[in-house]
A protein has these predicted regions:
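N-terminal metal-binding scaffold of metallo-dependent hydrolase/deaminase domains
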Residues: 12-57, 66-68
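Divalent metal-coordination and catalytic microenvironments
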Residues: 26, 41, 46, 65, ...
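Metal-associated gating/positioning segment near the N- to mid-region
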Residues: 66-137, 212
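Active-site gating loops and adjacent loop-to-helix segments of metal-dependent hydrolytic enzymes
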Residues: 78-99, 108-111, 141, 149, ...
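Short, acidic/polar
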Residues: 99-107, 167-178
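Divalent metal-dependent hydrolysis catalytic cores, especially in the metallo-beta-lactamase
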Residues: 102-128, 142-153, 184-197
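Histidine/acidic residue-rich metal-binding segments in metalloenzymes
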Residues: 130, 171-190, 195-215
């Protein structure tokens, strides 16, 4: 929301359209100027048409809200996971179809919670890539999803439940190409051990992929 739009005069708009689709009244968070008190936000379809100091005209629907913010971004999600303390155990009990249904539901929850962009960096069966494609086409309700699908790991490495085991430079290069071909918009590698994923044998401070494999 730019400074100019927040100061926009309402005359031209009200003359062109007799009624807005939706007007929101409340505080607006502006990325440049912080919290702006008592603004009118005009919504047409899925876009914000303008932000005004005064009510710009009649509307089919008017809602009073506490705060309108820009869409939030979450850079580390796993849509196939649930919110339990041991989501890997849940994955082991679920079929691929159940995991897909869950991921679709989680995508919808992200949008309903104000998150409009996510980066999904690890999913079984490349489910997040399929969900990302469906969201982009408008087949489901979801945010913009940048998904890696399966992650690239060494044999026995971190997150084996959705890892593509890749040993050596050529194998890693091949795995990257395969993920790109599937539609991955980001590549996730497990360069070290982690703190969750395997019951034994993991050390987050230990290198797994070599420097040559990574670069």
């Amino acid at each position: 929301m730019s400074d100019g739009r927040c100061q926009r005069n309402d005359d031209s708009r009200s003359k062109i359209m007799s009624e807005y689709e939706l007007l929101l009244y409340g505080d607006v968070w502006d990325a440049k100027r912080g919290r702006q008190r008592g603004k009118w936000v005009a919504v047409e379809g899925d876009e914000i048409e303008g932000v005004y100091d005064e009510k710009p005209g009649p509307a089919a629907e008017v809602k009073e809200v506490e705060l309108v913010t820009p869409g939030l971004i979450d850079l580390h999600v796993h849509l196939v996971w649930d919110g339990t303390g041991d989501p890997v155990e849940t994955l082991r009990r679920q079929s691929e179809q159940e995991q897909t249904i869950h991921a679709v539901a989680m995508a919808r929850e992200q949008v309903e919670g104000g998150v409009t962009t996510v980066r999904d960096i690890g999913s079984t069966h490349d489910i997040a890539i399929s969900v990302a494609d469906a969201s982009r086409r408008g087949d489901i309700t979801g945010p913009r999803i940048y998904a890696s699908g399966q992650t690239i790991i060494i044999s026995g490495g971190h997150d084996p439940f959705w890892g593509m085991e890749s040993d050596g430079v050529d194998a890693v290069r091949s795995s990257v190409r395969k993920q790109r071909d599937k539609g991955a918009r980001v590549i996730k590698i497990s360069a070290t051990g982690g703190v969750y994923g395997q019951a034994v044998g993991e050390d987050p401070g230990m290198s797994e992929l070599s420097r040559e494999e990574v670069i």
